[in-house]
Amino acid sequence: MAKRHKHFESRGGFRKKRGGGRGSQRGRGSKRGRGGRFRGFEETERSASEPGAWLNSSVPLGDGDLSNPDMMVDNYRPRKHISQDTITDHYFGRKSSLKLNSMRMAGLRHNDWRDPNNGNSASFRKRPIEFIKANCTYDPSRDLILQLANRSKNQESKEPEEDANKCSEYAEHSEKDMEIDTAATENDANISYDESDTDQEIGNFNHSIENSKHNNNISECDITAVTDQELFFVDEEGMDISQKPTKVVHITEHEKKMGSNVEFHNVLTVGKVEISLNQDENDEVYVDRKPTAKYHPFHNYISNVIERMQEEENIDSDDFEDEDDIYLDNSGNDMPETELDQDEIIDLQRHDDKDHAVQTCAIPTNTLSNDLDTLHITESNDDRITINNHNMDSTVETDKEKDPEFGFLEEDYAVNTSEVIVDNIRLGLNDNSYFLKCYRFFGDYSFHWIDQEAFVSFLTEDLELPMNRVGAYLAYVKNSLVPDETPPSPTYSDIPFSDTSNESDEDNALPNVDAVSSCSNDDEDEELGDDVDDLVSYSLKYANSRNIDYETRALEFTGKGKKKKLLVNEQLDLDNETMETLQAKLSKRMENKAKKRRLKEDFIDKENMNSDDLFLKYPYGFHVQNIRDEFELFLTRNKDRMSFPPLDPHGNKVITKFATCYNIKSSKVGKGNHTHIMVEKVKKTKWSRPNYNMVLQLTRQRPVFMRIDVRRPKEDAIKENSGRRGPTAKFHVKEGEVVGENAPEIGQDNIGRRMLEKLGWSSGEGLGAHGNKGISIPVMARVKKSKSGLRHSKEDEDTGRSSSFRKK
């Protein structure tokens, strides 16, 4: 019989008596019942009577004191043994109040720990600390030094007599040192230390340490007998260091410049405007204002020539001023206005006009520069520019501050201008027209022409653009569409450089530019040569048109279908024949495209056009529009299933995607080349709406799907692929044919033949010098198409076959 464990006894090994109080036992064990106060007493009494059993109780004996004589007496019933929990409770405390088996509480009695008046009940960190003075001074470092000195001396010592003498000397020195220390402590206030005394004391101390290394017979009792005052010296006053000068050293700290963590870009893009930036050493960003004029290789030469011309003009102008002064003096003093006749006055006026023309045309005077300084340009409201002179007109208009470009003010970003897309502009005399797209204004996403007045009202009222920024925005739109026409750089091609320095007075009198060109230096012109002027003028003339980027645009058409025509710009000035040729090419191109384009009607069999069987209706393949139409018809029919012909794996996947969009179940049927898709209606198909967005995406992808279980007739395949393969080859080669056998001889017009004939070659001769000429008959190259050997020709094959037949 198997052994029963202890836990079976509590499950019905013997019946227990009902306990008093409320309720009774429930279940199999007494621990699960809700009996009275003394439930399970008979069981505990029976188990306690067994030898070696513990009395299991959580009530401490004798208030937790094991030395209590009443410990064995229980308040409720007598205890025969001490339980294990009682001892644990005595040393470590209750489980509910303290940690389980805490060693910190093992040294405390349980009853003492509960007593609040007991001083030992406080924690160790809260108890007071008591300090007790030691009987002797504890100096382990000094003892360690002496022990090491004795050990080293014992290893080196050989003669004990010398050691004894040294020990006596060490004792004498130690007594002297002790006397000095005691005297120093008594007369500490009257002693002043110098640097020499301190050095001597340090030397004596080192000497005493050296002597102590040689001593090995001094006992520890001699050291302990010395008092602390004799061993240690306390300097209460310290050294007087006020008399020593202190050097002040000033160190300049160089602060390291911290690099900025911001990445710098030299181009700032605001809309379609690019601004070049630069950064200095202090990480400050500024606008890089570079000159707009492009550098030219002859720039320095031209500038030097103009400077020399100006210098010579200044020299000549001084001479003219002197002559003018003399003439004015003579006219003012000798010839008063009252004495002159009318004819003489006219002659003087002519002479003055002549001199004035020479000065203004040939020589720039100071009055011209003054007039240029007084001139200024003003801009009116109607976009017209007027030039005013301070000296000529008394009413001076103030310069109108130019508004900054669009995108440089915060007001420009308060409006969302991305809603308006301007694609073209038509410039007019007063107003412009804009070709723009704006859903907020037109209600669609197509481009429309709009005049400037309506466009400005939309910007100010709907987009809430400030009125003062409308002009800047319109200028920004215009600059983005119409490129700025940079003025051409001066070519100076119309300024001839004269070879002689002598000029007639008649040439100076006329307002011609030749007077300016006469100031050039003759020596430099001779050195540079005659062709330098032409080279400079030619290079400057075509400098701007050398690297020009031409915009490429698609052809513009009008009309649809057969009425589609080509739009040609009127600025090209094409004749009627050219226009007709272009239109004919366009129509031919459209016809070829229409022939190549395959429609969904091309895949449907005309005999089975209304059939429900797709295998008969589409004998060779599908167009993607055919697949969509079949799904639409399948939704309207009463049929529950429909099978598609076998297609390639990608085509089957496309049909599965179409079925998912129409909420139809799809499954594969068949094997190999006969694998096709079968679709079936479900409950969701009737009540759900198809996903036409996904269907539209599928129709824009692969257009044609051909069947893989049937083959098309050869005639249809040839017609379809005839345009792709191109024309057939015109030349064919045969086995054993000589390459170039029927080629004509190289004519005498050939350059290579002429060169050979000049070198002495004639037709029929070999190439090379006399005595070392090459072959006269060229080597013939034959065509080899078969896999037989090089010497195995077609004639040999024929002869071999005939001989074999003869042998048989």
UniProtKB/Swiss-Prot annotation:
Domain R3H: 621-683
Localization of this protein: Cytoplasm; Nucleus
Alphabetically ordered keywords of this record: Cytoplasm, mRNA processing, mRNA splicing, Nucleus
Disordered, as annotated region: 1-67, 151-180, 485-529, 764-808
One Gene Ontology term, aspect cellular component: preribosome, large subunit precursor
Keyword Nucleotide-binding belongs to the record: no
Domain G-patch as annotated: residue spans: 748-795
Principal location class: cytoplasm
Residue ranges, compositional bias (Basic residues): 1-20, 28-37, 782-791
GO annotation, biological process: maturation of SSU-rRNA; mRNA splicing, via spliceosome
Family annotation (Pfam families): G-patch
UniProt KW Nucleus keyword: yes
An example Gene Ontology molecular-function term: enzyme activator activity
Segments of skewed composition (Basic and acidic residues): 39-48, 153-179
Database matches in InterPro entries: G_patch_dom, R3H_dom_sf, R3H_G-patch, Splicing_assoc_domain
Family indicated by similarity: Belongs to the SQS1 family.
Record function comment: May be involved in splicing.
PANTHER family in alphabetical order: G PATCH DOMAIN CONTAINING PROTEIN 2
Full protein name: Protein SQS1
Naturally occurring in which organism (per UniProt): Candida glabrata (strain ATCC 2001 / BCRC 20586 / JCM 3761 / NBRC 0622 / NRRL Y-65 / CBS 138)
